[in-house]
Amino acid sequence: MRAPTMVIKLLFNMKPSAQRAQLNLSPLLLPGRHAMNSALMLGNVGAMGYYFLDPSFVAGMSMLRTATALSTIMGVTLTAAIGGADMPVVITNLNSYSGWALCAEGFMLNNNLMTIVGALIGSSGAILSYIMCKAMNRSLPNVILGSYGTSSTAGGKPMEITGTHTEVNVDNTVEMITNAKNIIITPGSGLGVAKAQYPVAEMVSLLNIKGKNVRFGIHPVAGRMPGQLNILLAEAGVPYDVVLEMDEINDDFKETDLELVIGANDTVNSAAEEDPNSIIAGMHVLKVWLSQQVIVMKRSMAVGYAAVDNPIFYKPNAAMLLGDAKETCDSLLSKIK
């Protein structure tokens, strides 16, 4: 019982001030985790084999309990080794697992409806997982096994980022927004955490009335789960036709006057294209740095989930507007009105 106890203690980061247990976003890389997971899987197979060999009720229930316990431990050790940036893929993959389990149950019970529904859930989850892994230039086993780096990572020393960043205030940003004609907003998980979608939606509505072309660029793995940002923007009343996927909008950045990055980091990291030794090399990102002017709205200069410095922060056409996203967007909205 010592191993599961150690896993649970390491997995949860207790914060008394928040008065609840919060999951630690950093991956839990246990020593020998691959060997441990392999042993747990073999134990599951062994329990299943014994279940078929011994038809007695006692043996069957014992093996069922054993398989349940081993599967629970393996579920924790597998999922905990995956970083926060890969959680959207984990969610869709677990969704796919549940579908195939339902499909197998349908076969066992000779229930066609369960089989069909399970196949639909399993295939849709698998397709979503594939789409997001392709967007990150990674394979599904690479994500599920808690590995780092894309298939294009050269393996050398990452480039060092030199220079200083430029900071602007709300008044400077309002002036840039007023002077811009074409504006693209790229939200990330920080927008959802701060609940800034409502002032952003109202600001976009005002800018559209003033004749400005404002659109949103959404990365496939942006947010805490698939489609989270699309849902948040729709909830706030943003029209569907101005919310575009990465492939639809990436070629338009070079013709954009102003780019507003709100709470995004890894999904707009230019190191994916500029540094072949970066662990995110080859990952498909939103090319926001091609815009004439970039304003990055973040709480701080800290790195994202991938723990990779973002060269965009130090580019000559980029400036940082630091602070809480909702408070900043509220201030921008009040000055634009």
Language-model regions: role of each:
Residues 120-180:
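Membrane-interfacial segments at transmembrane helix termini in multi-pass membrane proteins
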Residues 83, 97-141:
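Mobile "lid/hinge" segments at catalytic clefts and subdomain interfaces of large enzymes
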Residues 159-325, 331-337:
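Structured cytosolic domains appended to multi-pass membrane proteins
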Residues 85-87, 138, 319:
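Conformational gate/switch positions in structured elements
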